Amino acid sequence: MKTLTALIAASAFAVTAGYVHAKDLGPDEALRLRDAGTIQSFERLNTTALAKHPGSTITETELEQEYGKYVYQVELRDAKGVEWDVELDATQGQILKDHQDT
């Protein structure tokens, strides 16, 4: 009985481990999506994020696919040194989240 329980538990773990809710997209995939018109240009997305925090500089960007949607994440540092995380819908260009990095 213990073997059966262990087998069921291991099988359940293997099945759920395969589900990933967010997938990082590499540069080649990101450029392909941009060129196909699936996502906004990176310049436009960066401009939208920077407009939210004038005077900031971009420190990092990342494109992910989350729950079937393309999300562009931008990390900013403002003039006071405060870091911000801005997430945009990469297809529509709308800001989804904007919060101070803690």
What are these language model-derived features?
Residues 2-102:
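Long, terminal "pre-/pro-" and other extracytoplasmic accessory regions
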